């Protein structure tokens, strides 16, 4: 058996070449030999450069379900990948030992904690010679488009490098609770439910009524007052139930509307992404049409406002009547 500073070559022989990282330790990763046996050795990851949208590209719902299934997480939105914890565990799964999961903040809730995780991910990319620039500043902001682009690329990178071995993500992170990052939008439709009894007038009356003294005879209300109070209470209960039903219907309709808007947004974003990739492929031809399309895709609101001002001034100048010459 090789020593702690030795590795196994693909043919099973000892490799005495010591390769050290910045900390002076050997970090091997797993790969297959020709015989199908498991061995540990240094090597390069399979890089993926294609980012074009194809039929194999997964939707945002499917890709989140894939992430949760592979690394046993409970994410609900693409934006929650901004913590970087899932990517760190993916790298440990693909290349065991290239990253220390003990240093990963699986319960990260703040931006500086997200940056910490992405620094670990960058270091693992460097060790495995992954030619991919991680847009950390964009990802940690939790924007949908930036995180969707990166996870789509990472899915292809995963498919190109996964060797099919079994992996227990919970055991690998030593039972750390992987709490998804907070999502402000999630609180809109998940308001805490209050018990109907706590909101009823009868409950408030029961809490506010003083305790009867021992030996004193409490005065009993008349039958007419009891009937009127019970009637008003039942009426208010029915009104509250009606309001609850109406609010639930509104929440359901808003959820459906939101899902429709998100699907439409994803559809048009995919179209724009395809146009952008075509423009990038033909950008070296110095085509005026391609350049105009690129200007439209990357134009900001401020830039668009500035471009409209000269046109408005030119139209106003054309509408002015010509001045008569003086003799």
From Swiss-Prot:
Changing residue 236 to A: Significant loss of phosphorylation and cell adhesion activity. GO terms for biological process: cell division; positive regulation of ARF protein signal transduction; positive regulation of focal adhesion disassembly; positive regulation of keratinocyte migration; protein localization to microtubule; regulation of microtubule polymerization or depolymerization; spindle assembly. PROSITE patterns: CH, EB1_C. Residues 57-159 form the Calponin-homology (CH) domain. PANTHER family: MICROTUBULE-ASSOCIATED PROTEIN RP/EB FAMILY MEMBER (PTHR10623). Composed of two functionally independent domains. The N-terminal domain forms a hydrophobic cleft involved in microtubule binding and the C-terminal is involved in the formation of mutually exclusive complexes with APC and DCTN1. GO terms for molecular function: identical protein binding; microtubule binding; microtubule plus-end binding; protein kinase binding. It is found in: Cytoplasm, Cytoskeleton. It comes from the Eukaryota. Interacts with DCTN1. Interacts with APC (via C-terminal). Interacts with monomeric and polymerized tubulin. Interacts with SLAIN1. Interacts (via the N-terminal region) with BAG1. Interacts with ASB14. Interacts with HAX1; this interaction is essential for epidermal cell migration. It comes from Homo sapiens. Keywords: Acetylation, Cell cycle, Cell division, Cytoplasm, Cytoskeleton, Microtubule, Mitosis, Phosphoprotein, Ubl conjugation. Adapter protein that is involved in microtubule polymerization, and spindle function by stabilizing microtubules and anchoring them at centrosomes. Therefore, ensures mitotic progression and genome stability. Acts as a central regulator of microtubule reorganization in apico-basal epithelial differentiation. Plays a role during oocyte meiosis by regulating microtubule dynamics. Participates in neurite growth by interacting with plexin B3/PLXNB3 and microtubule reorganization during apico-basal epithelial differentiation. This is Microtubule-associated protein RP/EB family member 2. Residues 300-317 have a biased composition (Basic and acidic residues). SUPFAM superfamilies: Calponin-homology domain, CH-domain, EB1 dimerisation domain-like. InterPro entries: CH_dom, CH_dom_sf, EB1_C, EB1_C_sf, MAPRE. The modification Phosphoserine is found at residues 9, 219, 236. The lineage of its organism: Eukaryota, Metazoa, Chordata, Craniata, Vertebrata. One of its GO terms (cellular component) is microtubule cytoskeleton.
């Amino acid at each position: 058996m090789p020593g702690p500073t030795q590795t196994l070559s693909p043919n099973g022989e000892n490799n005495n070449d010591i390769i050290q990282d910045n900390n002076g330790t050997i970090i091997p990763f797993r790969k297959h030999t020709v015989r199908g046996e498991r061995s540990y050795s240094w090597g390069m990851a399979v890089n993926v450069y294609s980012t074009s949208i194809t039929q194999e590209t997964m939707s945002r719902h499917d890709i989140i379900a894939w992430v949760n299934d592979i690394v046993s997480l409970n994410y609900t939105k693409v934006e929650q990948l901004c913590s970087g914890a899932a990517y760190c565990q993916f790298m440990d799964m693909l290349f065991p030992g290239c990253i220390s999961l003990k240093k990963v903040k699986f319960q990260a809730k703040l931006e500086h904690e997200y940056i910490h995780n992405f620094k670990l991910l960058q270091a693992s990319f460097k060790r495995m010679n992954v030619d991919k620039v991680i847009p950390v500043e964009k990802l940690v902001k939790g924007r949908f488009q930036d995180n969707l682009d990166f996870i789509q690329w990472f899915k292809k990178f995963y498919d190109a490098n996964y060797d099919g071995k079994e992996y227990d993500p919970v055991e690998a992170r030593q039972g750390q609770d992987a709490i998804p990052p907070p999502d402000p939008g999630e609180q809109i439709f998940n308001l805490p439910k209050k018990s109907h009894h706590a909101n009823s007038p009868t409950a408030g009356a029961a809490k506010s009524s003083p305790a009867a003294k021992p030996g004193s005879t409490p005065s009993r209300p008349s039958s007419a007052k009891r009937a009127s109070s019970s009637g008003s209470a039942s009426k208010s209960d029915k009104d509250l139930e009606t309001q609850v039903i109406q609010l639930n219907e509104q929440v359901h309709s808003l959820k459906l509307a939101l899902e429709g808007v998100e699907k439409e947004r994803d559809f048009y974003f995919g179209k724009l992404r395809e146009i952008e990739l075509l423009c990038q492929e033909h950008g070296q031809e110095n085509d005026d049409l391609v350049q105009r399309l690129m200007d439209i895709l990357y134009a900001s609101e401020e830039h668009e406002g500035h471009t409209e001002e000269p046109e408005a001034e030119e139209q106003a100048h054309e509408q002015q009547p010509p001045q008569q010459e003086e003799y």
